[in-house]
Regions:
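Terminal amphipathic alpha-helical/low-complexity segments used for targeting or macromolecular assembly
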Residues: 1-43, 146-169
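Left-handed beta-helix
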Residues: 42, 52-53, 57-60, 65-66, ...
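C-terminal catalytic lobe of FAD-dependent flavoproteins
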Residues: 46
Length: 169
């Protein structure tokens, strides 16, 4: 798995090997039986398209919708949910029912992101937060839709990383 300075490899966390194995199985499409057994053991079901750089430090209990979009450098902690908002949906299409996570979003453990909304780039979703509204870039969300907006452009490490990417292009 490709790593960035935002998510360096930590040799002391063995779960990253499990998550890398899971993501490689998911991307390759091979080993369906092993993939299903691993999903059953981990309690994780990640559907839809996967980015090249998705970070799952603790790959347990993660559920994502089939049409949700996940950007590069996103971190999903354990027991987070990216799902539809309306449990009694009777419409014709499931195309726009799941959230979109832009680049660099960090979703803490137990967070629920519900509905067809967009989480802005490099935002942080706090533990056990429930998000049902759009979140602007470089914001922090906690509780139930408590959004703290920042105008400084986020963490200095993230700014340095983004600046170095722009210089490389």
């Amino acid at each position: 798995m490709k790593r960035t300075p935002v998510h360096p490899v930590n040799p002391h966390i063995r779960n990253s090997f499990v998550s890398d194995f899971y993501l490689n199985l998911k991307r390759s499409g091979r080993g369906r039986l092993i993939l299903r057994m691993l999903e059953h053991v981990l309690g994780t079901e990640i559907n839809g398209s996967l980015p090249q750089r998705l970070h799952l430090p603790h790959p347990y209990g993660i559920l994502t919708g089939s049409t949700g979009k996940i950007g590069e450098d996103v971190t999903l902690m354990h027991f987070c949910l990216l799902g539809p908002k309306d449990p009694w949906y009777q419409g014709d299409s499931w195309d726009n029912l799941f959230p979109t996570l832009e680049e660099g979003v960090y979703v803490s453990s137990g967070a629920k992101i519900l509905g067809p909304l967009t989480i802005g780039a490099w935002s942080v979703i706090g533990a056990n937060a429930v998000v049902t509204e759009d979140v602007p870039p470089f914001s922090t969300v906690f509780g139930h839709n408590r959004i703290l907006r920042t105008t400084e452009g986020g963490d200095p490490r993230v700014r340095r990383y983004l600046d170095s990417r722009q210089k490389a292009q």
